[in-house]
């Protein structure tokens, strides 16, 4: 009987926990770990392209970087998306539309702010018609700097979001 329990604890699945330095003792902890792993490896972003940063976002989705291999599939509907990539200058007239789209997204939802204009207003920071950062309208999880940021920078931001989701396990 002791050998039977030892074989369960020495299973390859449980060895992966030992390498990380912890062992799951409750089923809810295991389910939380598995759901955050699955959620981080199947992101469905919705594009909210407002300016030149949107071109770099499309470049990231093209064949050279191929976001499909990371489990990232772009969606056109906010009800199917769990990540919104805000790329470009957010004007005061566009801010209510951004909030409306964000509210239509499924929980848990994440926002990536891409480019200097989305992060803090950018070149048009002092204009009367520009919101000085999309974080004044929606909560932002990852900021990608640059004017416009490169495709590699956006890819790095998406990978950082995946790591953040893995770190913050949410109960379902």
Swiss-Prot record:
Gene source species: Ehrlichia ruminantium (strain Gardel)
Localisation per UniProt entry: Cell inner membrane
Gene (UniProt): nuoB
Name under which the protein is recorded: NADH-quinone oxidoreductase subunit B
Family per similarity comment: Belongs to the complex I 20 kDa subunit family.
Function: NDH-1 shuttles electrons from NADH, via FMN and iron-sulfur (Fe-S) centers, to quinones in the respiratory chain. Couples the redox reaction to proton translocation (for every two electrons transferred, four hydrogen ions are translocated across the cytoplasmic membrane), and thus conserves the redox energy in a proton gradient.
Keyword Ribosomal protein among UniProt keywords: no
Predominant place of localization: membrane
Membrane topology: Peripheral membrane protein
């Amino acid at each position: 009987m002791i050998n039977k329990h030892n074989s369960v604890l020495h299973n390859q699945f449980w060895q992966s926990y030992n390498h990380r330095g912890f062992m799951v003792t409750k089923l809810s902890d295991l389910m939380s770990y598995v759901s955050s792993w699955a959620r981080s490896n199947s992101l469905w972003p919705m594009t909210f392209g407002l300016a030149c940063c949107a071109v770099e976002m499309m470049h990231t989705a093209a064949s050279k970087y191929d976001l499909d291999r990371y489990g990232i599939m772009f969606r056109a509907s906010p009800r199917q998306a769990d990540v919104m990539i805000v790329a470009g200058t957010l004007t005061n007239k566009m801010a209510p539309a951004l909030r409306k789209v964000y509210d239509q997204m499924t929980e848990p939802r994440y926002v990536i702010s891409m480019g200097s204009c989305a992060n803090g207003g950018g070149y048009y920071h002092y204009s009367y018609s520009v919101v000085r950062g999309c974080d004044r309208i929606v909560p932002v999880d990852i900021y990608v700097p640059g004017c416009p940021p490169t495709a590699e920078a956006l890819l790095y931001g998406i990978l950082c979001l995946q790591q953040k989701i893995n770190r913050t396990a949410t109960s379902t």
